[in-house]
Amino acid sequence: MQTKTIGVVIPIYNVEKYLKECLDSVINQTYTNLEIILVNDGSTDENSLNIAKEYTLKDKRITLFDKKNGGQSTARNVGIEYFSGEYKLKNKTQTIKENSLIEFNIEGNNPYEIYTVYKSYKAFNNEQDLTSFTYPIIDYIIFLDSDDYWELNCIEECVPRMDGVDVVW
């Protein structure tokens, strides 16, 4: 039984060559109670951000942050702060359109210069959901480098061993 919610933070910087394999390994886990945060850290290659948007659109568990380059640690911090409810999100998209990304801005303090936050239309039932967006409550947070991947049952096997652990590196 999957009672624990796992937060997965994946920093992205110029990894178009590896990113699909990484994201496929996460979204295809047998353990499905995941909240996945992708943080594009100012990638300058041609496709990293586009690949991240593609996966965000097709999986409602994914939230994508696009920010100014600041390094892997700032990208991880964005994920931690998101799960802590630090950001006030204001939607830029007024209506939900099928097969589209909903865009949000950060209101107030934005130390990591986050440009836009993206979420799939699949994560919202109606327009009212856009204004009452709530942060997921997670039990554990895991960081995965975007040029890495997980074996199929990785989380399923690891979660029972995580009691008493707050952060897994």
Region annotations inferred by a language model:
Residues 1-169:
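Nucleotide-sugar donor-binding/catalytic module of glycosyltransferases
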